[in-house]
Swiss-Prot record:
Monomer. This is Beta-mannosidase. One of its GO terms (biological process) is carbohydrate metabolic process. Exoglycosidase that cleaves the single beta-linked mannose residue from the non-reducing end of all N-linked glycoprotein oligosaccharides. Belongs to the glycosyl hydrolase 2 family. Disulfide bonds join 167-176, 540-629, 732-761, 764-769. One of its GO terms (molecular function) is beta-mannosidase activity. It is found in: Lysosome. Gene3D superfamilies: Galactose-binding domain-like, Glycosidases, Immunoglobulins. The gene is MANBA.
Length: 879
């Protein structure tokens, strides 16, 4: 949603200023620590860590063990100071406010040495009345308290009962009692990220002065009238009216492409007032709806709303308006004891394909527009249509949601509560209410947001006994839970936004949870709602490992990032899987060993005598393992779309954990810190393809399903091929008769006992051959070429090291890699080191002598740079 505020100055009458003045206080500030031993300039928006780094007082916080070495920063109390002059007489204004869009987090704000307010919530806007205090020359001070010390103090004062958890596991090197502070929860440490509890003015800060009124919030929501079959637009504008007299005027709504030019008379009385405008769109006007990526266009309409008020005051708001409906469908299913759980967009059931979003950096001032676009473009480039903004991070910046609107990425928006119980004392709840009210107002105009969710895993934490809470206090914890998420957050959301569903938690049993008093004994019931699923010990190639659930909003496996990413934050002594650095960077208990165990199920572990080579091979194999595991699991969910087996199934969402990284470390991500694609992300591009053949075995029978997310039916054929590991010559193939693949369906296309299939392919055994398959029509490929391994690759017979070469050429801004191989090669990995960009495909099975792959650079590069940086690896290279 593009939103601009134009403050149009009107002439002053009788010495009385009627305009609204906004004075930015962004830019250069000064900061000092508690005892004044450190004094330095700091940029606003920004944080203390970034200021220290920019002045070279500290090194890169992500380098090696610096997250431990720089813990002192978060334990100190920092003060931000800015001296500024005003070039007009502020006494002529009825109201002057000092506005902070975001303060991180606990602080006392002073103007000219006089306290004007306190802050305790990173997620809300603060506006302080300084009308009678502001001078020609002013000094603002923001005196921060250490968030770590504050959280501990709040916990110590909560003596009535324990509010768990106290501290993160020691392996995370984190801080304690994060649930007692309204701050980015993962800033105290998580199992994929460091602990950097920041302090600073992390969003815009300004002075606003006005005499009549000021427009604080501008919101709009399209509403479809099913009975009349017409679109309406509800526009809400929240004003602070300081004039003692009635303020009259007009509100003019213009949407030229929809032939809308509507004038409304409005009246504003003293106080906080909301103007509601309703625009009815003529039925004869064709309104193009907003669709998720892969299902249609993201059509938006330019709208201008102008307020012309008494005294010549004029406000103008410009925004992009999108029209779409969303419905969460929970209804009985034939042959199943539960309810469905899926989303309809514009009346069409949509399978949500995507991932989970975490903060892109511990230091939000480093998250640039280019970084956001790169990461979100990578989402749609991998055929995803949805992201879940996870509840332990932040409500993302405006540009994030604007890009999601533009790209067609549906957002499951958590409120920022995660993996903990929370206090419900009065001042905490007051702060939360302000937070939720602000965020709903700020975000509800975005079509990309399709649902609100109250928290991440807190229902499960409470009802499944994660924190060994005493049974005698269960009633108290349940009461607190309902108070926070139902009586407050849910109530505020439903009052402020009736256009999208609200879910209490994730995972949850949806309507069943509601019926059971907002908490279910088992929030992971596969017959209801959404589930989170993790299992690192079972064989991930076995599809029976995975839950046949209605909707899976978290699942995944870890891997390490590439060597080129790690190299930037490590030294030579760190380049071993057993190094102190490797252990320090891993924040999941037993995470490194569990990756090796999963690898060993199907691959040989690297055994090179060269330590660096062995380390690089291990990094590669963790990515192979992760990609193959998540592929198997995701394909299981996609093919379960139309199935009910033993009452289970009708899966309509697969959001793996996680999309992006917050730093350079092992995690569940498919995008490394900086945006480089892991092998998993290339796999996601294939397993989330709109049209996909999925192969698996059940009782020695090979089944191939066709899965379609296409909006219409298509005629096609399935080709099944069998290759031997020892030769690039095709052994045998089958071609089905033409069939019609219906839109939005998953159906069996092929089934054959594996012994029968191999019998028709001379010399083939499970160990010596591999199956591939694809969908096509008239010789045109319609789907990715998928494959099915008939045995673990550690038992593959005839698999040789392949000599793979590349000839690189340039076509415009794209580079062409013409590959040649001497042998069949699984998991072919093309790498150009630190040159930013992505390939058209990667991590693939190469069964033919030649293949062409394209490289799309994100920054200017050259053929010679690519040739110098290029390296190719396939599985046999690690033996």
């Amino acid at each position: 949603m593009l939103l601009r505020l134009l403050l149009l100055l009107a002439p002053c009458g009788a010495g009385f200023a009627t305009e609204v003045v906004s004075i930015s206080l962004r830019g250069n500030w000064k900061i000092h620590n508690g005892n004044g031993s450190l004094q330095l300039p700091a940029a606003v928006p920004g944080c203390v860590h970034s200021a220290l780094f920019n002045k070279r007082i500290i090194k890169d916080p992500y380098y090696r063990f610096n997250n431990l070495d720089y813990r002192w920063i978060a334990l100190d109390n920092w003060t931000y100071i800015k001296k500024f002059k005003l070039h007009s007489d502020m006494s002529e204004w009825n109201k002057v406010n000092l506005v902070f869009e975001g303060i991180d987090t606990v602080a006392v704000v002073l103007l000219n040495s006089v306290p004007i307010g306190k802050t305790d919530n990173m997620f809300r806007r603060y506006s302080f009345d300084i009308t009678h205090m502001v001078k020609a020359v002013n000094i603002i001070e923001v005196r921060f308290q250490s968030p770590v010390i504050y959280a501990n103090q709040r916990s110590e004062r909560h003596t009535a009962y324990w509010v768990p958890p106290n501290c993160p596991p020691p392996v995370q090197d984190g801080e304690c009692h994060v649930n007692f502070i309204r701050k980015m929860q993962c800033s105290f440490g998580w199992d994929w990220g460091p602990s950097f509890p920041t302090q600073g003015i992390w969003k815009d800060v300004r002075i606003e002065a006005y005499n009549i009124c000021h427009l604080n919030y501008f919101m709009f929501t399209p509403i479809y009238d099913n009975y009349m079959e017409t679109w309406n637009l509800k526009i809400e504008s929240s004003f602070d009216v300081v004039s003692s007299k009635l303020v009259s005027g007009e509100a003019i709504v213009a949407i030229p492409e929809l032939n809308i030019q509507q004038r409304n008379n409005i009246e504003l009385r003293h106080g906080e007032r909301t103007v509601k405008l309703f625009v009815k769109i003529d039925k004869a006007v064709i309104v193009e709806t907003w669709w998720p990526h892969g299902h249609g266009n993201q059509t938006g309409y330019d709208m201008t709303v102008t307020f012309e008020l008494d005294g010549g005051l004029r406000f103008e708001k410009s925004a992009k308006v999108y029209f779409r409906t969303v419905e969460l469908v929970e209804e009985p299913i034939q042959n199943s004891p539960g309810l469905t759980f899926y989303f309809k967009i514009n009346g069409l059931p949509i399978f949500l394909k995507g991932s989970n979003w975490i903060p892109a950096d511990s230091f939000q001032d480093r998250v640039t527009s280019d970084m956001l676009r790169l990461l979100l473009q990578s989402v749609v480039d991998a055929n995803m249509n949805a992201l879940r903004v996870w509840g332990g991070g932040i409500y993302e910046q405006d540009e994030f949601y604007e890009l999601c609107d533009e790209l067609g990425i549906m957002i499951w928006q958590d409120f920022m509560f995660a993996c903990a119980l929370y206090p419900t004392d009065e001042d905490f709840m007051d702060s939360v209410r302000e937070e939720v009210t602000h965020q709903v107002r700020r975000l509800k105009s975005h079509p990309s947001i399709i649902t609100w969710s109250g928290n991440n895993e807190n229902e499960a934490a409470l009802m499944m006994g994660w924190y060994d809470t005493k049974p005698g206090y269960l009633h108290t914890y349940i009461k607190d839970y309902v108070t926070l998420y139902v009586k407050n957050i849910r109530t505020i959301v439903l009052e402020g936004d009736q256009t999208r569903p609200f879910i209490i938690s994730s995972p949850t049993n949806g309507a069943k949870t509601t019926a059971e008093g907002w908490l279910s004994p088992n929030p992971y019931d596969l017959n209801y709602g959404d589930v989170h699923f993790y299992d690192y010990m079972s064989d991930c190639w076995n599809w029976r490992t995975f839950p046949k659930a209605r909707f899976v909003s978290e699942y995944g496996y870890q891997s390490w990032p590439s060597f080129s990413t790690l190299e930037k934050v490590s030294s030579e002594e760190d380049w071993s899987y057993e190094s102190s650095f490797a252990l320090h960077r891993q924040h999941l208990i037993n995470g490194n060993s569990e990756m090796l165990q999963q690898i060993e199920l199907h691959f040989k572990l690297p055994n090179s005598a060269d330590q660096l080579r062995r380390f690089k091979d291990t990094l590669y194999l963790t990515q192979v393992m992760q990609a193959q595991c998540v592929k198997t699991e995701t394909e299981f969910y996609r093919r379960s779309r139309n199935e009910i087996v033993d009452g289970k199934g009708h899966t309509m969402g697969a959001l793996y954990w996680q999309l992006n990284d917050i730093w350079q470390a092992p995690s569940w991500s498919s995008l490394e810190y900086g945006g480089k694609w892991k092998m998993l992300h290339y796999f996601a591009r294939r397993f989330f393809a709109p049209l996909l053949p999925v192969g698996f075995e059940d009782k020695d029978v090979l089944f191939i399903y066709g899965v379609s997310d296409l909006p219409s039916d298509h005629q096609m054929m399935l080709t099944v091929r069998v290759h031997t590991w020892s030769s690039l010559e095709l052994v045998c193939s089958e071609l089905t008769n033409p069939f019609v693949m219906k839109a939005g369906e998953s159906v069996v296309l092929y089934s054959k006992p594996v012994p029968e299939l191999l019998k028709g392919c001379p010399g083939c055994t499970r160990q010596s051959c591999v199956v591939s398959f694809y969908l096509s029509t008239d010789g045109e490929l319609l789907s990715p070429i998928n494959y099915h391994f008939l045995s673990s690759l550690k038992n593959a017979k005839g698999l040789h090291k392949a000599n793979i070469t590349a000839t690189i050429s340039q076509q415009g801004n794209t580079f062409v890699f013409d590959l040649k191989t001497s042998a069949v090669a699984p998991f072919v990995w093309l790498d150009v080191g630190s040159i930013p960009g992505r390939f058209s495909d990667n991590g693939f099975l190469m069964t033919e002598k030649t293949r062409t792959v394209f490289f799309y650079p994100w920054k200017p590069t050259s053929k010679s740079e690519l040739e110098q940086s290029f390296h190719v690896t396939s599985l046999a290279d690690t033996y």
